[in-house]
């Protein structure tokens, strides 16, 4: 809805930001949090994004030398009454502790009844780590982790279902880039 207060986590270069901000710019609020350096320099304050705000600027995401996944240090998102928190294709970048921190601050940022929406690349259920699946994550694992943070699982969408993706190749391979199977999950804060 155009009157929502939304928080986008890890917006990268702002591909989704450019879709979200115009929807809420007049009647709602848009906040970007965690890993916002690229959009804060190139997008925030520009035409069409004048009212968009950066929050949780003191948060840090980093990968220790030799580590497969990122860690997250944050004291919160700086918002406590959001209608929706969204994150697109980056849940897989974090290890269990980083994902737990992301889920906790998302829970804390939402008002009761608020929506937590997560989209990421599909990994086969219970498949171990390897070089080809490091940027994929098991949706069942994600559901369990997000529920453990206090959320209630509401629904999933098949919007990004790609039956031709064999779930065996790195998402950056030319043969699958842009055509990966992705899961889209919706949770609510009770």
Regions found by a protein language model. Give the residues of each.
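Short glycine-dipeptide loop
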Residues: 2-3, 26-27, 110-116
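Conserved class I S-adenosyl-L-methionine
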Residues: 2-12
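A short glycine-rich, Lys/Arg-flanked "PGG" loop and its adjoining helix->strand segment in the class I
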Residues: 21-22, 100-113
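Conserved beta-strand signature within the Rossmann-like core of class I S-adenosyl-L-methionine
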Residues: 31, 113-125
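A short, conserved alpha-helix within the catalytic core of class I
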Residues: 69-72, 93-106
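A short acidic, Gly/Pro-enriched loop at the edge of an enzyme's catalytic core
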Residues: 75-85
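Conserved Class I S-adenosyl-L-methionine
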Residues: 129-156
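Core SAM-dependent methyltransferase catalytic element
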Residues: 149, 164-190
